[in-house]
């Protein structure tokens, strides 16, 4: 732990301590890989008093990327599943995130230092005017290196892992459907 680590950590903790302000919402963003795994033999369904049984053999169907954000003080969530994780997908997600906060002056975005997590991604994928306009919607707060645990979206990823990412899901379409169902149902019920 050095001075830069402590400085970034304290900046994030200061941000989390701020009261709710719709003009300056605090939103935590990250992405994670998801592996698409199918069954080679159909699982044996559950019976009363018995657990479902699945064969140890499985089929690899590639991977995809889950991009997600959460506003910790309200529980508002946004999620997208993409075939890959590049500057293009980051830009698409940030455009959607900005649309979710039309009244915000600036979205205070907590994220890690990944090479795609900066405004240059916008300029590589949008016109200069659109990129500038999108960049003005955000104020970036970077977690210290090796400190993703400071980003509250990690808690959401843990919850998603327990709900649906802890089992075999064979296609990107099915994964997206399941994740968006959970995100939308949590939003309606106020579950966190």
Language-model features: where?
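Short coil/turn segments at beta-strand junctions that form active-site/ligand-binding loops
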Residues: 23-24, 104-106
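C-terminal anion-handling pockets and recognition modules
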Residues: 146, 154-192
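Charge-mixed, compositionally biased segments that are often intrinsically disordered regulatory tracts
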Residues: 1-59
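Acidic/histidine-rich, metal-coordinating catalytic segments
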Residues: 105-118
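Mobile genetic element proteins and their domesticated derivatives, centered on retroelements
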Residues: 28-30, 69, 75, 94, ...
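Short, aromatic/basic amphipathic alpha-helical patches
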Residues: 120-131
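RNase H-like polynucleotidyl transferase catalytic core
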Residues: 53-58, 130-152, 168-171
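Electropositive, glycine- and tryptophan-enriched low-complexity nucleic-acid-binding patches
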Residues: 47-105
